[in-house]
Amino acid sequence: MTETIITVRGEHSAWFPAERATAAIGVSIDGADRATVFAQATEAAATLRESIIARHDADTGPITWWSSDGVTVTNYRPWNQEGKQLDLVYTASIGVRAKFSDFTALEQWIDEVALLPGVGISGIDWALTDATWDAVTADVRQRSVGDAVSKASTFAAAIGLSTVRAIAIADPGMLGDVSADTGGAYEPRMMSKASMDVGSASMGVSLKPEEIEVSSAVDVRFIAS
């Protein structure tokens, strides 16, 4: 009986609605006096934290988790248009992150905290819950293996063979003879795209999360006969 070794890469991607949004908020105050900018940044951050604590509940949300950095103060000496170096300017900064399960509540909160002095929105990360991630990862992995079986079967049929049997399975690159851009271990990855329109405070904030892509790949070696 004729047997042929076939080695292929199976891949699968799927898209899922975002379930969590982590907002990164920064407080930054500039001024000529170190103590003043420190006090102003601390006050703004305290108000920001109070708004988070009022919404925080690990189980029911809308904020399920949050963190806050301490105050850092840096300084620099700017130059004017005539090339003269000016007096020291101090900058007090604090970073805050808050994870939301309710995107409408997130919009309302950003609209509220944007009114605080020195507060700016650094960005928003979209994600799935851990439970959803575990479930969809398992499914995507299985489907990537199914894709490998389908490819191998097609190749086998093209050379007149009818059955394929897997003899090795591994992360991409670990079988040693599959050329691809990805080398080494390959874990399912989560990618997201979203748009964030931060207008004036009076106009409000509009968030439009897009679906999250979960992808997986696997190398499989078969004996075809």
Language model region names:
Residues 1-225:
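Short, charge-dense linear interaction motifs
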